[in-house]
């Protein structure tokens, strides 16, 4: 059954509608067009090139209805025909988008008879028609030749059938091209993924990495040769490691463009001599040729000069004709190597900081065509991966160097951090006194009277008394060396030094022994706690975690939380790992992991931030009557609270010890405050501000109330044998509160290197003359108040306020000065010397100044405020109640 023309037309449309293989589709189109128009043969050209350089490429040529697909494709690829837009019949159709119907080909000047001469075929009629996409852009040209039904030319009916069929074919061709592009994109992505994997697999071998990238690029882009020039790496690596933590800049999308000028080239040509490595991959070779070109080699190579041009300008160069480009850029010399070179695609390779570290170069497409924008886009991805790979390799190499340097530094540090053999031998030979000699069992222990060697002996005694040396088979020489090494690794800061570590360890020892808390601990935990106490402030710099963060110190970058505590633990591990210092060497692996976990947790617990996190959970356990502390979490809580209790135990020492330690703490804090003002230009908090030193008593009271008392109170509730810590803290709170009240009355007390006395003492002698001191005395007539029945509505303001003393100092007041001043004042009041010493009178501060039963008759008040010189020996004020007045004055003084 024969199909009519309409049915055949629809059948042929269905034949091509779902075809996505571009070769098969084009073959079907030409065969079907031959059936519809009775054409002898046909050709199909596809549009290629850039907007400024478009041309037609013969996809299939001279296809008849009997030509097999394979033969047609093979012939087209073997004899690739390229027709620029505007040249020849097909070129004119592509340029004008207009159909051309030629009845006699040889009479048309646009016809090229060379093919007829080669094949012996005679072309008579030609019908050439454009193929457009849905946007109206040319995507191809179809051409049919000679009618087979006896007609000499294509008529209007043929033209209409041809046009209608090609309309549908245009849609099919565009779909097939899109499918082909998606397949290519998929393949490209697979290659890029493989390259990404290679970057990390080959990070220790730059040559293998670059060779693999070049091989993939050459195969994907179908070019003859591929080269990579690398800039002198020594000039680029100086800032790699410093910028590792910086956010890398995004690489900007680079569009290919023609480089027209070279005005700045010569000024920047110093870059030319920086190429030190050249990778070349050409022909069928799978291995790159790696060389180190000399300056002479670079200067006599046109390809190298073009690469230097790209490295200088930082722009991609897509050269269609090398000879023309070289003539336009006369600063580049043409050498013989470019005789066989036609097209070049050259692109800079940059690192994360957008610094040019090399140039990638593609030479000659296998098809003989110029490189397209699509080629440039794909090649850019290879250049980016090449840059990442080179950068990553450099970083890896530098990291390896840094690791080697770190090992050397650790070896040196370990050597210098370890105690000397002479010191160790001496400590081994020294006799170790009993624990009672050092007062180790007491919560009132102080190290003030111990020399440095005694502090080490005291530590050894604590280990012996806890039976740790024999229990865990610690070699005595190793223990001695470890103790000396720990002492050596404390810096000579004012408070957080070796002596502070000794005091913390002794408090832990006293809590375990005197406080009977050892019954709740295993021997391994006792070992870990004592080691943690001795190491909990190793290498302390006299500054806190907040200071490390503010200054962005390396420690703050290394440890984001509990900065110093993590550093202390790392220093502890470093000492233990040093030769001859591992006191845990005889432990089993399981015991070693357990004791190290205890040490780490205990040291980190000395961060008050950790204390505040754990405190509520501990308080809840105690309030619920917990008595079993053997669970892992509960034991960790208990050890953490014990570490904090030991760390702040100076607050529970006798007053003569506590206020000396407080002065050391204050001095260290003030030093940090000075650094914050100097380095950060910020105002430090009150406790670190030297200008607010008089507020220290008040801040000590706050510290006791917020941290110390709640902690010691809850520990004493559960473990009553450590009550001395709580009681000592209470007593010191009363002393600090007393000082705080005196400071509020205008007395300073911390102007000296030591604060042996709670009230400020100034240099002075008994013979110094009291002068330049003005004071004001206001006296209240107590009887007058009682006569008014307690109603003070008629009492003058200065009488209602009671007795007051105001001293204006123009110089420093010493104790002797104040004593003479008080004597002068008393003598001016009643002409007699005070019968009570200053120390005794200070105990009367709490006496009621408004006592209704005075021991002496009421006296008239002095009247209004009177101003006297300190050198005055008499007063017109009359007599007053001596005992009350003396108590008040001495309290104020």
Swiss-Prot record:
Biased composition, class Basic and acidic residues, residue ranges: 789-800, 844-853
Subcellular localization(s) per the UniProt record: Cell membrane
Disulfide bond sites: none
Lipidation sites (S-farnesyl cysteine): 890
Statement: the UniProt record of this protein carries the keyword Nucleotide-binding: no
Residue numbers covered by the propeptide annotation in the UniProt entry: 891-893
Positions with a binding annotation for a divalent metal cation 1: 500, 536-537, 647
Catalytic activity: 3',5'-cyclic GMP + H2O = GMP + H(+)
The protein's name: cGMP-specific 3',5'-cyclic phosphodiesterase
């Amino acid at each position: 059954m024969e199909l009519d023309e309409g049915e055949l037309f629809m059948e042929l449309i269905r034949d091509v509608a779902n075809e996505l293989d571009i070769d098969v589709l084009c073959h079907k189109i030409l065969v079907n067009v031959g059936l519809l128009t009775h054409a002898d043969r046909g050709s199909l050209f596809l549009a290629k090139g850039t907007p400024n350089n478009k041309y037609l490429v013969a996809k299939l040529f001279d296809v008849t209805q009997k030509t097999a697909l394979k033969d047609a494709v093979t012939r087209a690829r073997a004899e690739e025909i390229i027709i620029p837009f505007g040249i020849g019949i097909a070129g004119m159709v592509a340029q004008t988008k207009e159909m051309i119907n030629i009845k006699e080909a040889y009479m048309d000047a646009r016809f090229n008879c060379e093919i007829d001469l080669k094949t012996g075929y005679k072309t008579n009629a030609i019908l050439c028609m454009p193929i457009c996409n849905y946007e109206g852009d040319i995507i191809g040209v179809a051409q049919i030749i000679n009618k087979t039904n006896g007609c000499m030319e294509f008529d209007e009916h043929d033209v209409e059938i041809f046009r209608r069929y090609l309309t549908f074919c245009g849609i099919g061709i565009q779909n097939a091209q899109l499918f082909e592009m998606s397949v290519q994109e998929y393949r490209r992505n697979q290659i890029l993924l493989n390259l990404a994997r290679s970057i990390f697999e080959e990070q220790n071998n730059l040559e293998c990495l670059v060779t693999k990238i070049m091989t993939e690029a050459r195969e994907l882009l179908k070019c003859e040769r591929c080269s990579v020039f690398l800039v002198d790496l020594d000039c680029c690596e100086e800032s790699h490691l410093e910028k590792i933590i910086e956010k890398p800049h995004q690489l900007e999308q680079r569009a290919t463009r023609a480089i027209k000028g070279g005005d700045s080239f010569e000024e920047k040509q110093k870059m030319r001599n920086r190429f030190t490595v050249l990778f070349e991959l050409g022909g069928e070779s799978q291995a790159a040729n790696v060389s180190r070109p000399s300056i002479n080699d670079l200067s006599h190579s046109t390809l190298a000069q073009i690469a230097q041009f790209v490295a200088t300008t930082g722009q991609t160069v897509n050269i269609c004709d090398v000879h023309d480009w070289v003539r336009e850029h006369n600063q580049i010399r043409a050498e013989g190597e470019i005789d066989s070179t036609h097209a070049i695609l050259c692109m800079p390779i940059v690192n994360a900081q957008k610094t040019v570290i090399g140039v990638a170069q593609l030479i000659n497409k296998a098809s003989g065509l110029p490189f397209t924008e699509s080629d440039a886009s794909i090649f850019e991805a290879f250049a980016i991966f090449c840059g990442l790979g080179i950068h990553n390799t450099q970083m890896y190499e530098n990291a390896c160097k840094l690791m080697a340097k770190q090992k050397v530094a650790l070896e040196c540090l370990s050597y210098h951090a370890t105690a000397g053999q002479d010191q160790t031998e001496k400590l081994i030979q020294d006799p170790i006194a009993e624990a009672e000699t050092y007062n180790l069992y007491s919560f009132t222990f102080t190290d003030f009277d111990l020399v440095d060697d005694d502090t080490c002996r005291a530590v050894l005694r604590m280990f012996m008394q806890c039976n740790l040396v024999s229990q865990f088979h610690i070699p005595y020489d190793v223990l001695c060396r470890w103790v000396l090494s720990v002492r050596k690794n404390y810096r000579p800061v004012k408070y957080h030094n070796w002596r502070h570590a000794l005091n913390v360890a002794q408090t832990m020892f006293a809590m375990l022994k005197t406080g009977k808390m050892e019954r709740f601990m295993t021997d391994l935990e006792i070992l870990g706690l004592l080691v943690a106490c001795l190491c909990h402030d190793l290498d302390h710099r006299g500054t806190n975690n907040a200071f490390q963060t503010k200054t962005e110190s390396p420690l703050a970058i290394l440890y984001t939380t509990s900065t110093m505590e993590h550093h202390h633990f790392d220093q502890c591990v470093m000492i233990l790992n040093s030769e001859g210092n591992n006191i845990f060497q005889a432990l089993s692996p399981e015991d070693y992991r357990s004791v190290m976990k205890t040490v780490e947790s205990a040291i980190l617990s000395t961060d008050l931030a950790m204390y505040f996190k754990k405190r509520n959970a501990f308080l809840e356990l105690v309030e619920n009557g917990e008595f079993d502390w053997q669970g892992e979490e509960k034991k960790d809580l208990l050890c953490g609270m014990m570490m904090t209790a030991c760390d702040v135990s100076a607050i529970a020492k006798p007053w003569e010890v506590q206020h000396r330690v407080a002065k050391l703490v204050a001095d260290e804090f003030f030093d940090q405050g000075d650094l914050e003002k100097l380095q950060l230009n910020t105002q430090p908090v009150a406790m670190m501000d030297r200008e607010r030193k008089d507020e220290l008593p008040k801040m000590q009271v706050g510290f006791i109330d917020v941290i110390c008392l709640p902690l010691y109170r809850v520990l004493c509730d559960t473990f009553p044998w450590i009550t001395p810590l709580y009681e000592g803290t209470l007593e010191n709170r009363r002393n600090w509160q007393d000082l705080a009240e005196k400071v509020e009355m205008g007395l300073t007390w911390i102007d000296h290197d030591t604060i042996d006395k709670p009230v400020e003492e100034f240099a002075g002698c008994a013979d110094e003359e009291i002068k330049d001191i003005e004071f004001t005395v206001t006296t209240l007539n107590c009887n007058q108040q009682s006569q008014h029945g307690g109603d003070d509505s008629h009492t003058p303001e200065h009488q209602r306020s009671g007795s007051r003393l105001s001293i204006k100092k123009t110089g420093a007041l010493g104790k002797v000065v104040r004593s003479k001043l008080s004597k002068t004042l008393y003598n001016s009041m009643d002409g007699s010397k005070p019968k009570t010493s200053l120390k005794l009178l200070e105990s009367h501060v709490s006496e009621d100044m408004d006592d209704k039963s005075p021991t002496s008759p009421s006296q008239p008040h002095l009247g209004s405020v009177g101003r006297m010189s300190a050198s005055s020996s008499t007063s017109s004020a009359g007599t007053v109640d001596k005992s009350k007045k003396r108590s008040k004055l001495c309290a104020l003084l």
